[in-house]
């Protein structure tokens, strides 16, 4: 039995290991990968490897894996990557896994600066990436530093602004909070809808020369071929849609494109190496095939996939709505519980206050009772003294009469009797005054006692009212092929039909232009980052982008502009570059 070969395939978020036979073809390995990860939109993807010369190459599906220039390592290493890009992610990418694989690959290209992304867009994209990873922002869970382990912005953007890690996190967090209620899958799609408007998104660049020998860039993408000047890969100067091309071929380093317009000359350029022309041919054929397919009715398979995706999305939305409803109910129950606890605490505090007031009133009552007793004792003492004084007065009266009688009996001298009479009269007068004073004091004590008695009655009534307040009960708790590398020439006929005239891509607008919310966010971020920007660290791409913005250009306006005039005019323009 032939010895098996170990293979390791790295997708954007997983590592897969397989054991293949020496006669296993590229297609068999590819099919095994897509089956393992559950991917059905296979036409966008391919398997990439590093050949023995160090170049990254796409695995040919119609040849044996071992017959290709794969480095003889163990295991054999491959990357599962998007080879072709959709025109419109929201219309073409059906499965969640397809969207996620594109999201992860595009995000990596942006972070590595393989796709130029302006700072304000980079921050907004970062917030969608965070929403897709963490879901809704929750201050109880997402504490300060929760993004410390995430790579979210291109190094260029970090170096161009005088902001530390915490300040970047604060800005991304603000926009993360803005996405509350957005499904993670929707955040992935929103990221891609904005990213697909970036000028370098989905473009494969190749260094070429025209007949004059001018060094230029050829950009191959989902919409056609574009020509760029050597120092500007953001702004194409000439464009040829796939619908204008009928044949592509190369002979060694010379590449020839034959337009559908018979009056137009051939479009000829030169690549530095034969292998580059092979790769250009393969990309042209694949992108042209997908361009034509999009302009035809969906196949039964695609219709079924879309129907299934709609059903799955509807199911997720229902589940989400159910979860949100349960969450709201739980939050309401928590709030109600907190309210009851708060009311309970307030009532307990009120009860405590009433108890303190009752205790204080009781103490005052006891004090008033004690004082009333003291006053009663004082009154009795004053009354007793008054009675004593009255008795003494009576005795004095009797003594006076006795003296008078004695004077008669003893016949004392008039002077002595007068003296004694004067003394007795003075004594009687003093006693009378003392008696009146004591009676007055007794009356005063009687009035004070009466007032105390009234206060006592009033306090007893208040106490009775306080004690009668009812007790408050406690509340209840609640996925063509590159040509054979041995051939120095190859040709491909790019079939066209009535659908070829459909150039609807020229009518497209950017997500920021369509979506007021995105437009508003980008405007706010531009303003917010302006003060922290270090102008001395601007790159050539930054300056090109700024100039394009100043002139009101975007990816689709530029596309319309570079396709103006007939094919011959544009080819002549290319030759004169």
Curated annotation (Swiss-Prot):
Top-level taxon in the UniProt lineage: Eukaryota
Residues recorded as bearing Phosphothreonine in the entry: 558
N6-succinyllysine, modified sites: 83
Modified residue annotations for S-nitrosocysteine: 117
Motif ([IL]-x-C-x-x-[DE] motif): 115-120
List of residues that carry Phosphoserine: 74, 407, 527
GO BP field: cellular response to testosterone stimulus; establishment of endothelial barrier; establishment of epithelial cell apical/basal polarity; gland morphogenesis; immunological synapse formation; membrane to membrane docking; positive regulation of early endosome to late endosome transport; positive regulation of gene expression
Phosphotyrosine modifications at: 116
Purpose of the protein: Ezrin-radixin-moesin (ERM) family protein that connects the actin cytoskeleton to the plasma membrane and thereby regulates the structure and function of specific domains of the cell cortex. Tethers actin filaments by oscillating between a resting and an activated state providing transient interactions between moesin and the actin cytoskeleton. Once phosphorylated on its C-terminal threonine, moesin is activated leading to interaction with F-actin and cytoskeletal rearrangement.
Assembly with partners or alone: In resting T-cells, part of a PAG1-NHERF1-MSN complex which is disrupted upon TCR activation. Interacts with NHERF1. Interacts with PPP1R16B. Interacts with PDZD8. Interacts with SELPLG and SYK; these interactions mediate the activation of SYK by SELPLG. Interacts with PDPN (via cytoplasmic domain); this interaction activates RHOA and promotes epithelial-mesenchymal transition. Interacts with SPN/CD43 cytoplasmic tail. Interacts with CD44. Interacts with ICAM2. Interacts with ICAM3 (via C-terminus). Interacts with PDZD8. Interacts with F-actin. Interacts with CD46. Interacts with PTPN6.
The protein, known as: Moesin
